[in-house]
């Protein structure tokens, strides 16, 4: 009340007050990062408990909820490393989780037994992940590159004795898709190029291998039915988008199961095959379809208006679901939903109670024409105070990849920047996934060229919006988006007033020559897309690498990097910063000693995001 009385005493103060109110509430980075993130959400065998991971302590730990009493217990107390829950052992009801060291991506699997963690997959510089359980539930399947860092072999471990046996030795960089319910069949894929995969059905008993992929296309395995009669997979060989097919193991007959005008991302059958879950990437939003196979009816979930359901996980009795849902204004939340009575319970409360969602920005899908007339999809986040009279600066946001996609959902850095007066245009440049295989392939061996022009034309589109200050537009991106940021500042030095490079590639020759050994299954695909750094392609890779053209940079840049990043090595950013500074460029450099390819800890995000805002405030706003 006093605020409004004071405003009335002075016309000038009234104007200032009105401006403040029109902007909505500005939140500090500490307030925004008091939001929590959660992942997982797995039922115990009797569906009485649910476990999930949350970073409410600053790093991800594991929490168990008694669904009858709603009582929650913190099961781990890590201070440094993030623990990501993988589920319960169906036999012993013990918790399995995954963790690496300092973001190095060498994740191991751990079992919590008698309140102590046991490393099930020990070894230096090795990586492992859970793949499923044997039919008798006594053994856990997992893949590990402990024998050869380039290849992941298939193992099973007895969950009681912890004895480990190799099931399949992998010498061709196969990627495991599925293991049959009867433990006899294994389906694995082999990446040939960005537009071609092979998929095989392997009989572990007879050692016979049959190719499921019958056309040159992309294939992704989606699992067996409960009787191991049919295998399900997605492919795009008869169109632009992925659709769901079935393959009869006995006859080899193929049938279409589900097709729409967007990519079917994944699909699975519940334990008794009562329901089929289908996830669709529909214009940068997730759409979930759950079909009751008894009558082919759709399951409609009540209480999720305004939210995108990202995923669902069924209890073994198929009566209760874990649902993960989010929106642009809300970080993902975990719910349980009872199909017998439509009872909905919210498990997490990840949005800080001090934040009013109405003060946050809603992502809106827009499209604009690029230099050659190609329609480029993007997501626009507009500040509350942006008007024709109160123009705002803007940033072009470039996603990772190559081949990634900016999607509708909550991103704390975007919300922080928009909340403090910056419009964000998250560009899905040519080469992005989700818009058909033709669009996806348009940047092959053309990276940093036409896709970069798409970003520049995104800037031109922003300049046409009446609420944008057309002289104050920068560019920001992480990983491949960090490369695009540096490419823009290097090869289009007059286009963007500032650039924020978050662990971006700046020397493609070195990066492609030093990719982690465990990426062997994707190496050929990456080389065919980007170019082989050990061939004449290295000339082009050199030419598009910002490091070697630092003399072109004119405007201020900021670089953020994790010292343990196995994908984009620290030396990439070190050398880029040194080169830019040698030509008199203003550079801010923030290095996290305990981070990898991404900043998992809240303290890293708070420091990094606040310094990004300070940088753009001082150099752009």
List PLM regions with ranges.
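Positively charged n-region of N-terminal signal peptides that target proteins for export
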Residues: 1-4, 621
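Sec-dependent N-terminal signal peptides
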Residues: 4-12
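Beta-propeller blade-edge and WD-like acidic-aromatic loop motif
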Residues: 21-26, 53-74, 100-119, 139, ...
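Cap/lid segment of the alpha/beta-hydrolase catalytic domain
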Residues: 349-471, 478-479, 506, 513-521
